[in-house]
Design a protein with these regions (language model features):
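N-terminal small-domain helix-loop-helix segment of the aminotransferase-like
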Residues: 1-62, 69
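PLP-dependent aminotransferase-like
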Residues: 72-118
Length: 118
């Protein structure tokens, strides 16, 4: 269910211990601290040649949470949302909670898990 099958890398452990020792133990800004956004911006620039500003970056607690937030922010009652199958079991419910209508489209192994026009 998404849990890693490897130990946490040492530099991540060390950074977490340092943050605790530095008193960084409170809730942070909901969509990401400036330092985290700057690190994400630098990663996209370095690895992908993409330029973003802080206001273009929003950090969330996971993929499903991000998708749910997007549905809640953008769907109008009755909007159709295409969900490629196979899909995570909660996707249709997330669409319906936001007032949308899920439309399931098969995108299985025969199509290399891509939606194709028939």
């Amino acid at each position: 269910a998404g849990e890693p099958d490897f130990d946490t890398i040492d530099y991540v452990k060390e950074a977490a211990i340092k943050a605790i020792n530095d008193g960084q133990t409170k809730y942070t800004i909901v969509d990401g601290t400036p330092e985290l956004k700057d690190a994400i911006i630098e990663k996209f620039k370095r690895d992908n040649g993409l330029d973003y500003k802080r206001e273009n970056i929003s950090v969330n607690s996971g993929g499903k949470h991000t998708i749910y937030n997007a549905f809640m922010a953008t769907l109008n009652p009755g909007d159709e949302v295409i969900i490629p199958a196979p899909y995570w079991v909660s996707y249709p419910d997330m669409v319906m909670l936001a007032g949308g209508t899920p439309v399931i489209i098969e995108a299985g192994i025969d199509n290399n898990f891509k939606i194709i026009d028939r």
